[in-house]
């Protein structure tokens, strides 16, 4: 049901009050909820609670919803009545719906259920009452507004669950997989090949760029179940998935996978999810995974069908472990287009040093045997002049600069309309986006993945 004018006005009037509370509001909300409903500690990433990434993401999303609630309600009314939605109205809300789609996929990956929205809503309203206002009319308005939003998420997440479950090799919630291969590829990165525990059964095709959620329960790690998402590095296939797991000082689950998971062990996995992927619809309107393609409301390249637009350049830009989802895209393009590829394809990678280049040999091999037109450029923050050879181990020393990538600025200036896919550490991603904006690249050609809770790059 659409929201009433009174409800909309009440929420709009208090949006700034919630924003003014800042992280104190969302920290209080999470503390209240996770204390009273400890079972949710099996769902939420507690590391993101400690570093405040999740509270910050929730605050930003909640305030954005409250400030956009009128336009969202109007759009919903048009859709419910089967009326056409003006393009300018969609454009106004593109950012909000992109974030919502990203959240819906993340929720699906951890198995969020409708009943959990009721728990979240109860604690959200209690936190508003404790920290913002006890006015009954305003609380009632927020309750209706939350129910409205929860309904949209529940409906979208059920669509995601159903689509995945109904595909060949698909499933819902979790499924057991066996570690078929485990290999160390750098000092801090292990590669895992995962196959179904039930021998001979198929796995769902992922969209190149998506991730898997790994579910771990081990008292050596935590008294609570831990869930982490890892980008799939393999090309879509019905036999196996590959992930590359990077270990850093704060990575508890990644460290567990490095130290305690061996070949033959079983892991629980959710199906592939994620709104960051290369859209590649074959003739007949089907996506690469055989499923109907979604409406292009998320940042996934949906505005361009790269199967049909064979000349559209693709630029893959990564920093550090951010190359993992882009490797899946590159492998996919190598299989789909191979030596017949006529589009320009760029692989641009920034690493700390040459020892951290996890997939150099594979990318070089793809360039030689599969995509001879692939244009590779490497930036190293630190160069060892006694060991690193320019033109072989790296191309440029220092931070990434797209202006220095041979042929890229000219391609953009010539109106070839490249699409840019980039992933990496936060500072790297801000720098890349700033460089693209300096070239006046429109948002519909900029696609990025954010590891962890979503936040704007600006």
UniProtKB/Swiss-Prot annotation:
Matching Pfam families: FAD_binding_6, Globin, NAD_binding_1
Residue numbers marked as site, Influences the redox potential of the prosthetic heme and FAD groups: 106, 449
GO biological processes: cellular response to nitrosative stress; nitric oxide catabolic process; response to toxic substance
Catalysed reactions, as listed in the record: 2 nitric oxide + NADPH + 2 O2 = 2 nitrate + NADP(+) + H(+); 2 nitric oxide + NADH + 2 O2 = 2 nitrate + NAD(+) + H(+)
Binding positions for FAD per the UniProt entry: 211, 228-231, 450-453
GO molecular function: FAD binding; heme binding; metal ion binding; nitric oxide dioxygenase NAD(P)H activity; oxygen binding; oxygen carrier activity
Residues engaged in binding NADP(+): 320-325
Assembly with partners or alone: Monomer.
UniProt protein name: Flavohemoprotein
Species, as recorded: Giardia intestinalis (strain ATCC 50581 / GS clone H7)
């Amino acid at each position: 049901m659409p929201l009433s004018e009174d409800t909309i006005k009440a929420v709009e009037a208090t949006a700034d009050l919630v924003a003014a509370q800042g992280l104190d509001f969302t920290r209080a909300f999470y503390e209240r909820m996770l204390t009273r409903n400890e079972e949710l500690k099996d769902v939420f990433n507690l590391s993101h609670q400690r570093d405040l990434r999740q509270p910050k993401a929730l605050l930003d999303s909640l305030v954005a919803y409250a400030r956009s609630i009128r336009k969202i309600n109007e759009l919903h009314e048009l859709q419910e009545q089967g009326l056409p939605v003006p393009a300018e109205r969609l454009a106004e809300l593109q950012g909000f719906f992109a974030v919502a789609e990203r959240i819906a996929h993340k929720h699906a990956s951890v198995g969020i259920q409708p009943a959990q929205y009721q728990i979240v809503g109860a604690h959200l309203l209690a936190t508003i009452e404790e920290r913002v206002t006890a006015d009954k009319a305003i609380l009632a308005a927020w309750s209706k507004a939350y129910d409205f939003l929860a309904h949209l998420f529940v409906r979208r997440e059920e669509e995601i669950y159903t689509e995945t479950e109904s595909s060949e090799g698909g499933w819902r919630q979790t499924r057991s997989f066996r570690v078929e291969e485990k290999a160390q590829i750098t000092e801090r990165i292990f590669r895992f090949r995962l196959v179904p525990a039930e021998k001979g059964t198929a796995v769902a095709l992922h969209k190149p760029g998506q991730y898997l959620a790994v579910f771990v329960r081990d008292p050596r790690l935590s008294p609570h179940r831990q869930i982490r998402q890892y980008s799939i590095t393999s090309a879509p296939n019905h036999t196996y998935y590959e992930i590359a797991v990077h270990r850093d000082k704060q990575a508890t689950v990644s460290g567990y996978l490095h130290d305690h998971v061996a070949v033959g062990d079983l892991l629980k996995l959710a199906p592939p999810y994620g709104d960051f992927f290369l859209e590649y619809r074959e003739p007949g309107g089907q996506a690469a995974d055989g499923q109907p393609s979604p409406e292009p409301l998320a940042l996934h390249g949906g505005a361009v069908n790269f199967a049909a637009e064979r000349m559209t350049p693709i630029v893959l830009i990564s920093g550090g472990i951010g190359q993992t989802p882009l490797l899946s895209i590159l492998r996919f393009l190598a299989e789909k287009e191979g030596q017949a590829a006529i589009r320009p394809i760029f692989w641009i990678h920034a690493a700390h040093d040459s020892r951290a280049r996890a997939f150099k040999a594979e990318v070089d091999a793809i360039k030689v045997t599969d995509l001879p037109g692939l244009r590779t450029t490497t930036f190293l923050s630190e160069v060892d002049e006694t060991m690193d050879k320019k033109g072989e181990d790296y191309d440029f020393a220092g931070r990434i600069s797209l202006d220095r990538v041979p042929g890229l600025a000219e391609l953009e200036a010539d109106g070839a309309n490249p699409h840019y896919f980039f992933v990496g550490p936060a500072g790297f991603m801000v720098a890349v986006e700033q460089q693209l904006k300096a070239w006046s690249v429109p948002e519909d050609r900029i696609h990025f993945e954010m590891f962890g809770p979503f936040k704007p790059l600006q």
